[in-house]
From Swiss-Prot:
Tetramer of two light and two heavy chains. Residues 1-31 form the signal peptide. It holds the Pfam family Me-amine-dh_H. Disulfide bonds join C221-C236. GO terms for cellular component: periplasmic space. It is an enzyme of class 1 (oxidoreductase). Methylamine dehydrogenase carries out the oxidation of methylamine. Electrons are passed from methylamine dehydrogenase to amicyanin. It comes from Paracoccus versutus. Transmembrane segments: none annotated. Belongs to the aromatic amine dehydrogenase heavy chain family. NCBIfam families: TTQ_MADH_Hv (TIGR02658). This is Methylamine dehydrogenase heavy chain. Its EC number is 1.4.9.1.
Length: 426
């Protein structure tokens, strides 16, 4: 008997197991879609809606429609036109070679769709909602082999690619995704990306012509803050900003005044409003520097403190990944904070302080109720506060004025970190 069992071909064993699993799945499906007293599809969906995720509700509605004979052909839906509350969640997936970006309606918490990306993709979104895009990297054999860097531009309604632009010589700086290492120019005509090696440079991608344009030699400075179609700023090691003008085919670099000292260490994720030119940059201790960037120059504002002297003495500090958000219409700053040891600035936080950017006055201190890594705000008159947990892969959505949690969206990949929005309201 033992020899007979051992001689059973492995493929027959696998086929038998597969058929058994299929039969079990079919029985479960019949149990779900053939109730003793059938209900109309709409009634079934309504009855099952409580306690279900968006995906579960959609699956139940589709199953009911199929059972009623109302739908038997696949349908590819289109997303509604973008608004100021649409939010993009980029999941670098802990340095995985294949990644995802989730597109969510912040008003409802509904996932509208997803796009795929490669290694350490960098997302951008046109402020007017006309497109969203990413700079990304893929390899010939998934995680090895020939490397290709490219920029992919997506239609915001169909999510289909409308441009796929290869970057010569694989020039992208592959680093944990920092929000402002890539940027769109204010006219949406060019995407700017950073090159680290063999020498510092900024690449220009012509989105209208759907082609790579050129590399601009820049000093050893970081981040890209566009102030006009041909002028952007970068942060330099001496505490100044480099103003880079690349009009007329030439690159001219000048430096602003030094705006912070050597021991005033800036976090890696400032907030920047492409529409107003406001740069908001906290330090590790919660001191916030601000500048207004224009094509002509930079104007620095008096620094403000996000935390009180008592809070700093009690080890309150900023922390997280994307720690800072700025709301243009209300001129308010949002900063992730918590009690933490020094040099723990990348650890998640449970609180957000809300500040008047003009006066430095604290407006609110919101207890989030979750360990949060990244924040952003919708750029409408009554903004939502988006708070993202990489650990639980969940986006929590709050009323930015009251701090009340309104809804949440879970199952967002493996380690989501970056939150991007459109600033399309007046």
């Amino acid at each position: 008997m033992a020899s007979a069992r051992e001689s059973t071909p492995r493929y027959l064993t696998l086929i038998g197991a597969t058929l058994a699993c299929s039969a079990l799945a079919l029985g479960a499906a019949q149990a779900q879609t053939e109730p003793a007293e059938p209900e109309a599809p709409a009634e079934t969906a309504a009855a099952d809606a409580a306690g279900q995720t968006e995906g579960q509700r959609g699956a139940a509605e589709a199953a009911a429609a199929l059972a009623a004979g109302e739908a038997d052909e696949p349908v590819i839906l289109e997303a509604p036109a973008p608004d100021a509350r649409r939010v993009y969640i980029q999941d670098p997936a802990h340095f995985a070679a294949i990644t995802q970006q989730f597109v969510i309606d912040g008003s409802t918490g509904r996932i509208l769709g997803m796009t795929d990306g490669g290694f350490l993709p960098h997302p951008v979104a046109a402020e007017d909602g006309s497109f969203f895009a990413q700079a990304s990297t893929v390899f010939e054999r998934i995680a090895r082999g020939k490397r290709t860097d490219y920029v992919e531009v997506f239609d915001p309604v169909t999510f289909l690619p409308i441009a796929d632009i290869e970057l010569p010589d694989a020039p992208r700086f592959l680093v944990g995704t920092y929000q402002w290492m890539n940027a769109l120019t204010p006219d949406n005509k060019n995407l700017l990306f950073y090159q680290f090696s063999p020498a510092p440079a900024v690449g220009v991608v012509d989105l209208e012509g759907k082609t790579f344009d050129r590399m601009l030699d820049v000093p050893d400075c970081y981040h890209i803050f566009p102030a006009s179609p041909t002028v952007f700023y970068m942060n330099c090691r001496d505490g100044s900003l480099a103003r880079v003008d690349f009009a007329d085919g030439e690159t001219k670099v000048t430096n602003t005044e030094v705006f912070h000292t050597e021991d005033e260490l800036l976090i890696n994720h400032p907030a920047f409003s492409l529409r107003s030119g406001r740069l908001v940059w906290p330090t590790y201790t919660g001191k916030i520097f601000q500048a207004d960037l224009t094509a002509e120059g930079a104007t620095f504002r008096a620094p403000i403190e996000a935390l009180t002297e008592a809070e700093r003495a009690d080890d309150w500090r900023p922390g997280g990944w994307q720690q800072t958000a700025y709301h243009r219409q209300s001129d308010r700053i949002y900063l992730l904070v918590d009690q933490r040891d020094e040099w723990k600035h990348k650890a998640a936080s449970r609180f957000v302080v809300v500040l008047n950017a003009e006066t430095g006055e604290r407006i609110n201190k919101i207890e989030l109720g979750h360990e949060i890594d990244s924040i952003n705000v919708s750029q409408d008159a009554e903004p939502l506060l988006y708070a993202l947990s990489a650990g639980t892969q969940t986006l929590h959505i709050y009323d930015a004025a009251t701090g009340e949690e309104l809804r949440s969206v879970d199952q967002l990949g493996r380690g989501p970190q970056i939150i991007t929005t459109h600033d399309m309201d007046s």
